[in-house]
Amino acid sequence: MDVTIQHPWFRRALGPFYPSRLFDQFFGEGLFEYDLLPFLSSTISPYYRQSLFRTVLDSGISEVRSDRDKFVIFLDVKHFSPEDLTVKVLDDFVEIHGKHNERQDDHGYISREFHRRYRLPTAVDQSALSCSLSADGMLTFSGPKIVDPSHSERTIPVSREEKPSSAPSS
């Protein structure tokens, strides 16, 4: 039985499942060895893999939900205070802007700024929109949808006919 042995260089952890954190919104929190040299960890230990779940959590989660009754946006803004955030509705868009000036942290000085824009569904009641910031830094923007009575759900009964269908058979 032949076993293929690969040089560690060919087992590098490069690609979309092992992105660098250098350019995400949390770049000021400090760096790990694999942020600077993502292939180094797999060269030293080919069985080491960065958790994909950890990568998703570190990316600044933004989630949009639009169901029948309401429209909701969840946005992770844990590095911003309510005074640093501006939420505006312009026509059919909601714009969320966050900016804080340079301040000192454990690694030096840092300033952050982001701008997100989401399209509002036409059925959202813009007079009843609300926005809140949780203690853990999750911004929730929501609005109820206007239910159109002409588009309400109703059940259509199925009747059984005694004669065969006149549709052509294939």
Swiss-Prot record:
Binding-site residues for Zn(2+) 1, renumbered to this chain: H100, E102
Record domain sHSP: where: 52-161
Residues listed as glycosylation sites in the UniProt record: S159
Segment forming the signal sequence: none
Gene Ontology BP terms: lens development in camera-type eye; negative regulation of apoptotic process; protein refolding; response to heat
Subcellular location: Cytoplasm; Nucleus
Assembly, per entry: Heteromer composed of three CRYAA and one CRYAB subunits. Inter-subunit bridging via zinc ions enhances stability, which is crucial as there is no protein turn over in the lens. Can also form homodimers and homotetramers (dimers of dimers) which serve as the building blocks of homooligomers. Within homooligomers, the zinc-binding motif is created from residues of 3 different molecules. His-100 and Glu-102 from one molecule are ligands of the zinc ion, and His-107 and His-151 residues from additional molecules complete the site with tetrahedral coordination geometry.
Descriptive protein name: Alpha-crystallin A chain
Organism listed in the record: Choloepus hoffmanni
Designated gene of the protein: CRYAA
